[in-house]
């Protein structure tokens, strides 16, 4: 069996004047939803076996691996379970901001009910990527 995930990591660069006309507002007048929309890119998961016909809702790059593991039938680590639960509350998160389960977009500069949740996520993601010897490996390993 083969499964492939393809995605774009950014939209092509275009002049700001073009974007202002396309959105009908200048960048400083955009809503957070419009601003985050500038960074949307398509993705595709393909396999040489049947995949569920489920439509994947709004998501972000940091969560695509969850779908890939699920479709491949691979059991989650504790960290991946955490990401799955996190995504139910905040289904998309980028360097610009994040979107909650109701579709409302927020800037990372805002302090709100999600601030602590995001700080916890960042701590765990940092530990996973850069924890070195202090990394809590058992949290990130796939079950045996």
Where is each model-derived feature located?
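Solvent-exposed soluble domains appended to multi-pass membrane proteins
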Residues: 1-144
């Amino acid at each position: 069996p083969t499964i492939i995930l393809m995605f774009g990591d950014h939209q092509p660069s275009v002049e700001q004047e073009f974007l202002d006309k396309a959105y009908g507002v200048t960048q400083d007048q955009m809503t957070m939803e419009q601003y985050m929309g500038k960074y949307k890119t398509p993705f595709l998961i393909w396999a040489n076996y049947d995949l569920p016909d489920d439509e994947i809702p709004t998501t972000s790059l940091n969560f695509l691996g969850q779908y890939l593991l699920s479709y491949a039938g691979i059991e989650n680590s504790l960290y991946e379970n955490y990401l799955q639960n996190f995504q139910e509350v905040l289904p998309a998160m980028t360097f610009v901001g994040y979107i909650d389960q109701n579709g409302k977009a927020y800037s990372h500069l805002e302090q709100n009910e999600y601030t602590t949740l995001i700080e916890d996520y960042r701590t765990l993601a940092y530990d996973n990527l850069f924890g070195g010897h202090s990394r809590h490996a058992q949290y990130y390993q796939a079950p045996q």
